[in-house]
Design a protein with these regions (language model features):
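Residue-level preference for short coil/turn positions at secondary-structure junctions
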Residues: 28-30, 60, 107, 164
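Short, flexible, glycine/charge-rich loop motifs used to bind or transfer phosphoryl groups or to couple energy/partner
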Residues: 22-24, 54-55, 102, 180-185
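Acidic, His/Gly-enriched loop-helix segments that form or flank divalent-metal centers
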Residues: 123-186
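Structural motif
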Residues: 31-33, 63-65, 166
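Core catalytic region of metal-dependent phosphoesterases/phosphodiesterases
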Residues: 36, 41-149
Length: 186
């Protein structure tokens, strides 16, 4: 059927399914933020993570922002894999345990979990290997990590986040190239 001509649509273009872009804005009260990114459980650096958490405790942060690639999602990757390496359930367990540690050590802090390109591997895996369960809440990464139960806010990849005047993105979201060398191109 034809689309009616209107002042807003003088050419009768078909209706759009695009969702208007709106950044996710962190509440102004969440202004003392510990940023953690690219932890890649289970390949994390315990020393570096311990230093970061100690710094967060010293500064009495009220917000923890996990800026993607908190998990590696090795088994959900389509890269060649070593069958002897850890499985996805182990990675999920390590990440859930880490979130429990954050809740224990920073009981008053609000936690935000931004999906990185490595977490996106899970959805891509489902899309290719198990499309019948794609979109089912029980198989969503946020559900598997129990983010809602833990009071953690999940933010999808490719969603700009603003903390005051600061724009926050994960490396793969930078349009200047791959995430590995983002700092070199800013």
């Amino acid at each position: 059927h034809e689309t009616p001509f209107t002042r807003e649509n003088p050419f009768g273009l078909p209706p759009t399914e695009a969702v208007p872009f709106e950044p996710y804005v962190l509440p102004k009260a969440n202004n003392n933020i510990l940023f953690l990114t690219d932890i890649h459980f289970p390949y994390h650096d315990t020393t570096a993570l311990t230093l970061a958490l100690n710094y967060g405790k010293e500064k009495n942060v009220n917000t923890i922002y996990l800026n993607g690639d908190i998990m590696d999602c090795y088994k959900a990757s389509f890269h060649e894999q070593d069958a002897k390496k850890r499985d996805m359930s182990h990675e999920l367990e390590q990440c859930r345990n880490f979130l429990d540690i954050l809740k224990r050590e920073f009981p008053k802090a609000k936690i935000f979990f931004k999906e990185g390109n490595h977490e996106m591997r899970w959805e891509r895996f489902l899309r290719v290997k198990a499309p019948i369960v794609l979109g089912m809440e029980e198989f969503e990464l946020s559900t598997l990590l129990k983010l809602g139960e833990k009071g953690v806010t999940f933010i999808r990849n490719k969603q700009l986040v603003k903390a005051g005047k600061l724009n926050i993105i994960h490396g793969n979201e930078y349009k200047g190239g791959g995430g590995i060398n983002v700092a070199r191109t800013l």
